[in-house]
């Protein structure tokens, strides 16, 4: 009986690559579908709330991998209302029951450590001070018309203190029970602001050459690895993305350099990269698969993200383009996404208007599971 079940599982994995098990360092995963880090703005006063335990545990499966929403490493690292942190004892204590709820479902949980840098406003900063950054250049408003405050360029002697904030936050995350941490080096936030030449503009050892611009990122990685161990550390990078008015003139060189730095830590767990922006071909959105050079270079687990659906996810895993695929909006709207992918079942549509609202239920924990939809349909038929 057990052998038959195992054979059936292997057959399913062969037919659906996303459902194949995977060994990620010390961790055994039962499938390749990862919850991407998603800002949800429901951690009041930057303290994780009890409703987050339900939200994350809904999306947890035995042997699945969840990555938390961006979690601030310090008071200066916050840029939006109701974003969680992990720099105070109160925050660490509040995370513990949330992590426990995920672990009870048998899932792994990584905490994404973030500092927004200049993507903030004075009213989100301690004592109304200016946001800190690699630069004093203000973000140019985009289509969202969000206006960020003019930042203050960090002095060279201040940078080690920010590096240490990441180190302490990593230690706090492990104390809260997380299985590991993901360093947020993507999407135009502080680490990205140092790395990309459009936003750096420094003339000290943290600016100018590619090596200098990546120095802050490398120092953060080294500090976090030294604190919690490389086998508990991943990083998210987006060399091609121009979010937050932050872009690089040579993203290929940037991504390649950073991967080489990651490889200096042989046990570093994973590299999570975001695809270039999508193109529209014959009315359909198409992923520009631009991560292959980095995947070939990196020695550890490679996670791809950026608009994937079931078909594309299966393809990139089957082709060896990625080991795991992170899903954001689809996982937000479908708490049982791995099961839906396994069954090729219809998906709930997400409601973008509730992504960043503060309601603890609506648009957060009220998306139906597949069984609930079936029951609803049966009720209608009767």
From Swiss-Prot:
Its EC number is 1.3.1.-. Transmembrane segments: none annotated. It comes from the Eukaryota. FMN binds at residues 37-39, 70, 112, 236, 307, 328-329. Residues 120-147 are annotated as: Disordered. InterPro entries: Aldolase_TIM, OxRdtase_FMN_N, Oye-like. One of its GO terms (molecular function) is oxidoreductase activity. Substrate binds at residues 184-187, 277. GO terms for biological process: jasmonic acid biosynthetic process; oxylipin biosynthetic process. The active site is at residue 189. It is an enzyme of class 1 (oxidoreductase). Keywords: Fatty acid biosynthesis, Fatty acid metabolism, Flavoprotein, FMN, Lipid biosynthesis, Lipid metabolism, NADP, Oxidoreductase, Oxylipin biosynthesis. Its cofactor is FMN. Residues 120-138 have a biased composition (Polar residues). Belongs to the NADH:flavin oxidoreductase/NADH oxidase family. Putative oxophytodienoate reductase that may be involved in the biosynthesis or metabolism of oxylipin signaling molecules. This is Putative 12-oxophytodienoate reductase 3. It comes from Oryza sativa subsp. japonica (Rice).
